[in-house]
Amino acid sequence: MDLGRFPIISILEDMLEVPEDHNNEKTRNNPSRVYMRDAKAMAATPADVIEHPNAYAFVVDMPGIKGDEIKVQVENDNVLVVSGERQRENKENEGVKYVRMERRMGKFMRKFQLPENADLDKISAVCHDGVLKVTVQKLPPPEPKKPKTIQVQVA
């Protein structure tokens, strides 16, 4: 069976074959290994974003991860990054083996574009029962400018 006839197969093969040489014209537009790894980590980390009157809340599921294993950062003054790594428990007992491994292990990451009215000095993060909640306070709305009155002179 010739798999070349199926365009989806060739697209998938192109995505999986990420070369190391970035000087080549053919490879310049292909995604890098880092991009592919980050995209996979982001897709596997579900999150909700909630807007409150005075703050934004980012709620991220983190089952089985301790709070000290989670890193929350702000990059480029407007990107909230939640990252970390979930490690498999090191239990090596003789004669014990996994029959099925469905829980995702490895690195995780989510990036969120922060709105212009986010107060970067007022960000807090709390992890409780496997759910991380990052709260970003809003900046107060700017005060409306008062109209300037111009004195009309009679000539």
UniProtKB/Swiss-Prot annotation:
Where's the sHSP domain? 38-155
**S-S bonds:** none
Q: Gene encoding this chain?
A: HSP17.6
Q: Which residues form a coiled coil?
A: none
Compartments reported by the entry: Cytoplasm
Q: Does the keyword Ribosomal protein apply?
A: no
Family listed: Belongs to the small heat shock protein (HSP20) family.
Q: What induces it?
A: By heat shock.
Task: Recite the UniProt keywords alphabetically.
Answer: Cytoplasm, Stress response
Supply the name of the protein.
Answer: 17.6 kDa class II heat shock protein
